[in-house]
């Protein structure tokens, strides 16, 4: 199984890339993380947030791996603990489907994409920069894996 992070946004600062890379390189080969950046739509010329999100949805759908479990990150999603994520990972691995975590653009994710998600997940109750979400998600995926392996990284 492969873990994909599809993120609307590009040209992240170096510290974001370094933080993200730090956790992705720690993952085992059977749970590799692949980042797919989606170029954000411009909000110029009076375009509505709805039209921007719809255009970004099309780009996201084109980048989604076929048959992947869709986990959409949204501020109104379910609030999982790290332990809940760790409990989900083995089941996801057993069913063999790749998992795609989707981080929307500045306006969020298109409602149609959120409606078809297998899981709608909130990563924090706080508002975070999109680049930081990449790092936090990669860290939580590594932490969840470490829990399943009784690795000493997670000590809580």
From Swiss-Prot:
Enzyme Commission no: 2.1.1.177
Keywords: Cytoplasm, Methyltransferase, rRNA processing, S-adenosyl-L-methionine, Transferase
Protein name: Ribosomal RNA large subunit methyltransferase H
Molecular function terms from GO: rRNA (pseudouridine-N3-)-methyltransferase activity
Biological role stated in the UniProt entry: Specifically methylates the pseudouridine at position 1915 (m3Psi1915) in 23S rRNA.
Subunit structure: Homodimer.
Root EC class: transferase
Cell compartments where the protein resides: Cytoplasm
Family of the protein in this entry: Belongs to the RNA methyltransferase RlmH family.
Main location (coarse class): cytoplasm
Native organism: Burkholderia cenocepacia (strain HI2424)
Binding site for S-adenosyl-L-methionine: 73, 104, 123-128
Cellular component, GO, one term: cytoplasm
Reaction(s) catalysed by this chain's protein: pseudouridine(1915) in 23S rRNA + S-adenosyl-L-methionine = N(3)-methylpseudouridine(1915) in 23S rRNA + S-adenosyl-L-homocysteine + H(+)
């Amino acid at each position: 199984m492969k873990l994909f992070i599809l993120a609307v946004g590009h040209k992240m600062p170096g510290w974001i890339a370094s933080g993200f890379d730090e956790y992705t390189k720690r993952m085992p080969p059977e749970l590799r993380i692949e980042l797919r950046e989606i170029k954000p739509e411009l909000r110029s010329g009076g375009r509505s947030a709805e039209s921007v999100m719809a255009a970004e949805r099309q780009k996201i759908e084109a980048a989604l791996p076929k048959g992947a479990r869709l986990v959409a990150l949204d501020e109104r999603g379910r609030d999982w603990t790290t332990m809940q994520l760790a409990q989900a990972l083995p089941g996801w691995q057993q069913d063999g489907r790749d998992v795609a975590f989707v981080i929307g653009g500045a306006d969020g994710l298109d409602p149609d994409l959120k409606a078809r998600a297998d899981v709608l997940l909130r990563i924090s109750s706080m508002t975070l920069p999109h680049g930081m979400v990449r790092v936090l998600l990669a860290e939580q995926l590594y932490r969840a894996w470490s829990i399943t392996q009784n690795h000493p990284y997670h000590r809580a």
